[in-house]
Amino acid sequence: MSETRAVLRGVRLSVDKGRLVADLIRGKKVDQALNILTFTQKKAAVIIKKVLESAIANAEHNDGADIDELKVKTIFVEQGTTLKRFTARAKGRGNRISKPTCHVYVTVGN
């Protein structure tokens, strides 16, 4: 069977925090991965769970795959653009605030 993927780009999440959760489900069966993500108390877990559910729906709808046989083939989180903001400081100065984004890629297959 071919592999099916889902992508979410520009997520307001740092890469390190996303990779921490992605490492938990890499190579696992889909139902086990969803269970892990449901009980992981991280913001990244909610985001990655939505992408995984999208990949499962894509596999079922587009390829007619059996959900019970699907595994998380690959999952990786890459760095996106960093939003740069400024905050006011004393004596007319300003400090930069970096708001990192990332891209989440999930591939499921047999």
Swiss-Prot record:
Source superkingdom: Bacteria
CDD domains: Ribosomal_L22 (cd00336)
One example GO MF annotation: structural constituent of ribosome
InterPro entries registered for this protein in UniProt: Ribosomal_uL22 (IPR001063), Ribosomal_uL22_bac/chlpt-type (IPR005727), Ribosomal_uL22_bac/org-type (IPR047867), Ribosomal_uL22_CS (IPR018260), Ribosomal_uL22_sf (IPR036394)
Pfam family, one: Ribosomal_L22
Keywords of the record: Ribonucleoprotein, Ribosomal protein, RNA-binding, rRNA-binding
Record carries keyword Methyltransferase: no
GO CC field: cytosolic large ribosomal subunit
One Gene Ontology term from the biological process aspect of the record: translation
Cross-referenced PANTHER family: CHLOROPLAST 50S RIBOSOMAL PROTEIN L22-RELATED, LARGE RIBOSOMAL SUBUNIT PROTEIN UL22M
UniProt function note: This protein binds specifically to 23S rRNA; its binding is stimulated by other ribosomal proteins, e.g. L4, L17, and L20. It is important during the early stages of 50S assembly. It makes multiple contacts with different domains of the 23S rRNA in the assembled 50S subunit and ribosome. The globular domain of the protein is located near the polypeptide exit tunnel on the outside of the subunit, while an extended beta-hairpin is found that lines the wall of the exit tunnel in the center of the 70S ribosome.
Record family assignment: Belongs to the universal ribosomal protein uL22 family.
Complex formation: Part of the 50S ribosomal subunit.
Protein name as annotated: Large ribosomal subunit protein uL22
